[in-house]
């Protein structure tokens, strides 16, 4: 960090946001370590936005680590690959973080297997034409690893009439406790930069802007140190450490000074946004012709004996991870993702999927996690001030309580909310505004629209 960086106010979005306790000191200095393979893997066929993957294997079939086991179910879909060598036990319903069970391929992992990845063929990715790169990205099963899990190749093919001029690389890692992206930027810098160049080639973008929160200046320095002297196409920018800086709309505004229009996409501004973890995997897997079979996650929180950043096979049950880290799972509350936007899980059989960036564990009875009494809204407007989308969470909450879900959408821009949790965090009445929004969206999705 330079001397003047100590005093410079870094870029940020224009409205709202909060400064929650970060708790990143628990794992920020912990290098990425590999966890053992579990005896059983459960690989859901829907780990991404879009159509579920379609099984290519049958019960009783032997599979090799890296082998395709499910094909993409359409353009907005990605394939699945075997995270370990083993035998397919079943294709059955399995618990998920979202609540309902979903179809998954259950693999009995061979203990004696070497677990080498035997699939793949080396290729000079940057020598390929853009269309072949897009196809390779889909074939690798790559999705947004920051949590959204949107298929990465779809962002490389913008709607007709749109062109991509800028690749925005999201290195904010803004959720409390989570540091997996921080460690990726420090330890997989070469892969990250190669993935960035691959994304630029595929989209036709002339420049890339890497945004990193200013509480991770070591990552800023690490990336800049790897750039060639005089590099102008790829630039690294420190942005203010303010939640939710890592949200797509917020980071685009912070870096470009432009807002994505309501109901619009980054492509409307000529932008494609990728997470640093996604691009690091792109730079790692595509040159080897391999698929995504594992990811880095942060395991942290007051209920974890050995917090850290771990490389785990996709499909690993949470229960196995917690056992490996010396945690008694029956005594804790477990959240998949970060405490702001993550989901508490009712079953520890839920597996790690492509969109899971962390596991936060709270001790039973932790006062921060105890059910708190909800009081009436006092019209303090703290939620309005905190909302980065400039919505009126107070009014959304009142309409939710009277079950006027349609008005929430038509009159108060319900679908503009991306459920960051800022409003609920600052509410002195403990009103669960984020949960109200999620319920309203779910009900509206299931309610037939009146064409009249």
Identify the residue ranges that each predicted region occupies:
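Gly-rich Lys/Arg/Thr-decorated short loops/hinges at beta-loop-alpha junctions or inter-strand turns
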Residues: 115-116, 144, 167-181, 303
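N-terminal, Lys/Arg-enriched amphipathic/low-complexity engagement segments
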Residues: 1-56
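Short, well-structured beta-strand-loop connectors
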Residues: 58-71, 90
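Acidic low-complexity segments
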Residues: 90, 95-150, 161-162, 217, ...
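Hydrophobic alpha-helical positions that pack around
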Residues: 206-318, 324-329, 338
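Ferredoxin-type iron-sulfur electron-transfer modules in oxidoreductases and energy-metabolism complexes
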Residues: 357-374, 382-384, 388-452
């Amino acid at each position: 960090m330079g001397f003047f960086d100590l005093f410079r106010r870094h870029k940020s979005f224009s409205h709202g946001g909060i400064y929650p306790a970060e708790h990143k000191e628990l794992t920020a200095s912990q290098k990425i370590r590999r966890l053992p393979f579990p005896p059983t893997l459960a690989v859901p066929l829907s780990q991404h936005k879009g159509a579920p993957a379609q099984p290519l294997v049958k019960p009783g079939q032997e599979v090799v680590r890296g082998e395709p086991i499910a094909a993409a179910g359409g353009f907005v879909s990605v394939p699945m690959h075997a995270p370990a060598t083993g035998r397919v036990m079943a294709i059955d319903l399995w618990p998920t973080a979202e609540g309902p069970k979903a179809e998954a391929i259950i693999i009995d992992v061979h203990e004696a297997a070497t677990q080498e990845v035997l699939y793949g063929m080396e290729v000079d990715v940057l020598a390929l034409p853009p269309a072949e790169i897009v196809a390779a990205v889909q074939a690798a099963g790559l999705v947004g690893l920051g949590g959204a899990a949107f298929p990465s190749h779809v962002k490389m093919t913008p709607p007709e009439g749109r062109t991509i001029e800028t690749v925005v690389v999201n290195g904010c890692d803004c959720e409390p406790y989570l540091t997996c992206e921080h460690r990726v930027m420090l330890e997989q810098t070469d892969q990250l930069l190669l993935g960035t160049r691959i994304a630029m080639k595929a989209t036709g973008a002339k420049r890339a802007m890497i945004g990193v929160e200013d509480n991770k200046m070591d990552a800023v320095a690490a990336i800049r140190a790897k750039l060639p002297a005089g590099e102008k196409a790829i630039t690294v920018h420190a942005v203010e450490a303010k939640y939710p800086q890592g949200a797509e709309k917020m980071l685009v505004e912070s870096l470009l000074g432009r807002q994505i229009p309501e109901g619009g996409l980054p492509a409307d501004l000529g932008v494609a946004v990728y997470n640093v973890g996604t691009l690091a995997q792109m730079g790692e897997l595509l040159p080897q012709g391999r698929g995504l079979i594992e990811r880095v996650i942060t395991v942290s929180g007051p209920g974890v004996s050995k917090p850290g950043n771990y490389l785990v096979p996709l499909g690993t049950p949470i229960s196995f991870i917690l056992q490996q880290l010396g945690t008694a799972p029956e005594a804790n509350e477990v959240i998949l993702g970060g405490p702001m936007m993550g989901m508490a899980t009712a079953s520890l059989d839920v597996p790690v999927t492509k969109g899971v960036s962390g596991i936060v564990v709270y001790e039973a009875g932790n006062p921060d996690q105890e059910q708190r009494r909800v009081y009436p809204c006092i019209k303090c407007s703290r939620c309005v001030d905190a909302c980065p989308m400039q919505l009126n969470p107070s009014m959304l909450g009142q309409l939710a309580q009277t079950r006027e879900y349609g008005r929430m959408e038509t009159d108060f821009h319900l679908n503009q909310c991306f459920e960051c949790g800022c409003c609920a965090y600052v509410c002195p009445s403990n009103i669960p505004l984020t949960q109200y929004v999620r319920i309203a969206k779910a009900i509206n999705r299931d309610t037939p629209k009146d064409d009249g």
